[in-house]
């Protein structure tokens, strides 16, 4: 596979329809890809942003390494909320991409920043047999419902990148996430970034490279299994 040194392809805006509800997402497919299946990275944006804001910083790396990037919009851009934004929404999004492009279904990954980071960790645990691995920046596991999440069917690989000067997500919160995951048999990788704050975009190329290095070797041992959850109907 010939991989371009820099991205020339454009990010496109796509739509996935779920129960007549049209949800936008942004897609980057490197020009250099051939017909062989490639990994898929789902990126979850921070509060107040959109999917394109997180797809764009991944374009060059995706072109060099040869993978596809998809970034959905949260239903409410201020926060990612289950069940509106997943797991079902992410499943249908992935299946929509797979219907158009050759995806290595055993190498589908999650990356999230800030609000998308906490949600990314949650989705990774809920769908540990569907996604191969997850990496997040500036986020941690929510304490609410955490014990149930830790009963994940698979010890999915996870990496957490956190700035030592992050004013929004304390370093201790990331360390606590690492510790509770480790206590339950996971092997999380915590990267404490010295003199770094909450600003992902300031150091995006370096963060993305480290995140991808932590993700790319992870592979499901068998075809992905999507787990269906039941949620109480909202009034």
Ranges and model annotations:
Residues 3-40, 85, 92, 115-123, ...:
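A domain-start/cap signature at the N-terminus of enzymes
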Residues 159-162, 166:
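Short beta-strand/loop motif that positions the catalytic acidic residue
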Residues 54, 106-154:
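Primarily recognizes the serine-hydrolase "nucleophile elbow" in alpha/beta-hydrolase
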Residues 31-36, 79-115, 130:
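Gly/Ser-rich "nucleophile elbow"/oxyanion-hole loop immediately N-terminal to the catalytic nucleophile
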Residues 167-173:
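Conserved alpha/beta-hydrolase "acid-adjacent" motif
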Residues 33-79, 143, 167:
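Short substrate-entry loop that stabilizes the transition state in hydrolases
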Residues 77, 193-200:
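Histidine-bearing beta->alpha loop at or near hydrolase active sites
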């Amino acid at each position: 596979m010939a991989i371009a040194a820099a991205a020339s392809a454009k990010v496109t805006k796509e739509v996935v329809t779920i129960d007549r509800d049209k949800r936008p997402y942004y897609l980057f497919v490197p020009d250099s890809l051939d017909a062989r299946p490639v990994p898929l990275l789902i990126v979850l944006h921070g509060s107040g942003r959109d999917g394109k804001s997180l797809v764009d910083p991944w374009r060059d790396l995706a072109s060099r390494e040869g993978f596809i990037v998809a970034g959905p919009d949260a239903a409410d851009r201020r926060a990612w909320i289950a069940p509106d934004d997943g797991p079902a929404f992410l499943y249908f999004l992935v299946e929509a991409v797979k219907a158009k492009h050759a995806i290595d279904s055993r190498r589908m990954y999650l990356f999230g920043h800030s609000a998308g980071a906490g949600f990314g960790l949650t989705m990774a645990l809920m769908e540990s047999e569907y996604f191969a691995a997850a990496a997040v920046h500036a986020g941690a596991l929510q304490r609410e419902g955490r014990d149930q999440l830790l009963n994940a069917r698979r010890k999915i690989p996870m990496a957490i990148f956190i700035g030592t000067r992050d004013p929004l997500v304390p370093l201790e919160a990331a360390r606590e996430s690492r510790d509770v995951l480790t206590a339950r048999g996971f092997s999380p990788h915590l990267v404490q970034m010295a003199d770094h704050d909450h600003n992902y975009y300031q150091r995006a190329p370096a963060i993305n490279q480290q995140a991808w290095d932590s993700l790319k070797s992870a592979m499901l041992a068998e075809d992905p299994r999507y787990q269906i959850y039941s949620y109480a109907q909202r009034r």
